[in-house]
Amino acid sequence: EVNYSFNDNLNLAVRYSVDYYQDNRLDYRPPGSASEGNNGQYIEDRYSNKLSQLNMFLTGGLDINSNIGLNYTLGYQQFESDYRRLSAFEAVFTNPDQEFLNPGNAASQNSLPSGFRELRRQNGVYGVLNFDIGENLLVELTGRGETFSTMPNAGIIFYPSASIGYKLTDLINLDALTFLKVRASYGEVGVAPPAYI
């Protein structure tokens, strides 16, 4: 993460992260074993997944006039997921010796190699505007536009939201009441489809 302040009212933050894992699995059943693979069975799976994410956003604030203040956030987000799987299944070994414990030790009709890859990318820009009006009224407006690699012809998908809140504590003068606020919100959200449906 890198942070930079242009001045007291404008700041930039950049965050980048990568998460990677690999999972290798091997299942071997020698010929003559007490299982369904009694003529020998070899199963190997190799899984890997890399998740990377970039976030950049500007935050700031200003006073529009003596009664209205504004705080804002403008940002960009990029997400990528790269999932891979390689698999091999073999049965009825050609050579039962364990020295030949690898793919290629079975006739083609008893060998089933397979591979799969899913690559997904997502890009989005967003903005949040928070208005403080007077001492009791708060208005928040947000918007987010996204593109998805799983929807290449959809263009930019936009999600708006808005909320308004009012502090009633000053209007209701009760010693037993320390804080009372009402809030109403509206928002739209969406989820991208999987890569293959």
Short names for language-model regions:
Residues 61-75:
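Outer-membrane beta-barrel channel domains
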Residues 20-22, 80-82, 147, 190-192:
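Feature marks short, surface-exposed loop/turn motifs that line or immediately flank catalytic pockets
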Residues 1-3, 7, 67-71, 192-197:
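Membrane-proximal, glycine/serine-rich, low-complexity loop/turn segments characteristic
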Residues 1-63, 120-151, 155-170, 180-197:
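Surface-exposed extracellular loop regions of Gram-negative outer-membrane beta-barrel proteins
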Residues 26-42, 84-113, 197:
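Surface-exposed loop/turn segments flanking beta-strands in extracellular/periplasmic regions
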Residues 156, 175-178:
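Short, glycine-/polar-rich solvent-exposed loops and beta-turns at beta-strand/coil boundaries
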Residues 12-14, 70-74, 139-141, 160, ...:
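Transmembrane beta-strands of outer-membrane beta-barrel proteins
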